[in-house]
């Protein structure tokens, strides 16, 4: 690529709408690295002859980060949606053999090509909304071959689409049918066979567990965390979504990157998160879709200064959501978060939830030029509009990878 000065733009370099530069420019060298940014009037003379790209007054933010997804799976769970509308709870469906286990059956039956094609279709709407980094979990295979298949597909998505993919091994997502009544034996399999094999193949960036009364106990979760720690892998946790099981405090003891969901999180757990530097990842899509009523403790998270991220939690059972912008709106309308909070929740705090705050979530000299250009009058519109296409252009590594076609 040619060294380029992107200009005629309004810059929000750190995802905070109160920290902006009008009539700004970004200079990107031939490696796709930002070498200068600031007011156009202060552009150094050394960049005067570089190629120019006019963004026509668009707002520019860091590329968005979707830090919690289950994008790779087989089938749908539309039938369970009808059950929930009839009053059957998520927990009841799971106990009847539906829920996660029904997706496990469909995922095991699908080959890699089928899973890739289906996941690619789910990924593309996110890319068109300015997402340049995404986390993708396994957890719908629940045996070594199927978990490997899922993680391989996630890696392939990162190789074939203009997005950085971070993989999370979620083998401890649910108890597979063949281990019914033998949860400890399944955790043996996760810790002693699945995780070592997948880590040795370079398929795992982090490790997650579903710690809940319909998932895995604190003791079982800790065993997985110990196995991950021995491998030098960071951990994260699905915690306190349906009850307060104390998982967040355990996650904090292992300095987890994030604890996610958190509707039933208490102040002691929040204090532990703050001390450990663990990010709170809130998932309003799941809250909305399964009609939860227990709100995450936003005020307590604010009080203790715990960074809050937002994510789609895209999955077939509780959040079939393919819009990070709608997630922003939900964060504001359902959780009463502010516009600065939700914007930072999908930029720098989301990057921190992946342990990648040094690479994503901000536009600074020395970083890769990953950014999105928005056709809005104010950044509040990113959380305001519902369903309107707002992203005009996405740049990754200094190269345009998406441009909205008008007319």
Curated annotation (Swiss-Prot):
GO cellular component: cytoplasm
Residues at which Zn(2+) binds: 68, 70, 238, 313
Top EC group: hydrolase
InterPro entries, per the entry: Amidohydro-rel (IPR006680), HutI (IPR005920), Metal-dep_hydrolase_composite (IPR011059), Metal_Hydrolase (IPR032466)
Binding note for cofactor: Binds 1 zinc or iron ion per subunit.
Positions annotated to bind N-formimidoyl-L-glutamate: 140, 315, 317
Pathway(s) where this gene product acts: Amino-acid degradation; L-histidine degradation into L-glutamate; N-formimidoyl-L-glutamate from L-histidine: step 3/3
Biological processes per GO annotation: L-histidine catabolic process to glutamate and formamide; L-histidine catabolic process to glutamate and formate
Entry binding sites for Fe(3+): 68, 70, 238, 313
Cofactor(s) it depends on: Zn(2+); Fe(3+)
Assigned keywords, A-Z: Cytoplasm, Histidine metabolism, Hydrolase, Iron, Metal-binding, Zinc
Presence of the UniProt keyword Acyltransferase in the record: no
EC number(s) per entry: 3.5.2.7
Compartment annotation: Cytoplasm
Protein name stated in the entry: Imidazolonepropionase
Gene name for this UniProt entry: hutI
């Amino acid at each position: 690529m040619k060294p380029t000065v992107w200009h005629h733009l309004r810059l929000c370099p750190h995802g905070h709408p109160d920290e902006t530069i009008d009539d700004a420019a970004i200079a990107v060298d031939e490696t796709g690295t930002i070498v200068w940014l600031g007011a156009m009037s202060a552009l150094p003379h050394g960049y005067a002859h570089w190629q120019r790209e006019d963004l026509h007054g668009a707002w520019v933010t860091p590329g968005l980060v979707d830090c919690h997804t289950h994008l790779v799976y087989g089938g749908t769970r539309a039938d369970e949606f009808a059950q929930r509308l009839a009053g059957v709870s998520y927990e009841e469906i799971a106990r009847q053999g539906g829920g996660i286990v029904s997706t496990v059956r469909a995922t095991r039956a699908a080959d890699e090509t089928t899973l890739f094609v289906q996941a690619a279709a789910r990924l593309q709407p996110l890319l068109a909304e300015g997402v340049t980094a995404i986390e993708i979990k396994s957890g719908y295979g629940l045996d070594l071959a199927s978990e490997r298949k899922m993680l391989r597909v996630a890696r392939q998505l990162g190789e074939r689409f203009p997005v950085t993919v971070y993989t999370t091994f979620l083998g401890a997502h649910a108890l597979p049918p063949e281990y019914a009544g033998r949860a400890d034996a399944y955790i043996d399999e996760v810790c002693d066979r699945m995780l070592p094999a997948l880590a040795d193949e370079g398929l795992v960036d982090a490790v997650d567990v579903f710690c809940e009364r319909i998932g895995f106990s604190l003791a079982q979760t800790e065993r997985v965390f110990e196995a991950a720690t021995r491998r030098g892998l960071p951990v994260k946790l699905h915690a306190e979504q349906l009850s307060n099981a104390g998982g967040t405090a355990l996650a904090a003891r292992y300095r987890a990157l994030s604890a996610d969901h958190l509707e039933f999180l208490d102040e002691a757990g929040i204090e532990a998160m703050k001390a450990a530097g663990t990010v709170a990842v809130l998932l309003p899509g799941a809250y909305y879709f399964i009609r939860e009523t227990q709100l995450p403790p936003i005020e307590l998270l604010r009080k203790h200064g715990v960074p809050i991220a937002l994510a789609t939690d895209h999955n077939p059972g509780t959040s079939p959501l393919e819009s990070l912008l709608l997630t922003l709106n939900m964060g504001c309308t359902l959780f009463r978060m502010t516009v600065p909070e939700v914007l930072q929740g999908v930029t720098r705090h989301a990057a921190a939830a992946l342990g990648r705050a040094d690479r994503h979530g901000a536009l600074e000299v020395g970083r890769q030029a990953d950014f999105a250009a928005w056709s809005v009058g104010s950044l509040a519109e990113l959380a305001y509009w519902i369903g309107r296409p707002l992203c005009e252009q996405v740049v990754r590594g200094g190269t345009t990878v998406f441009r909205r076609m008008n007319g």
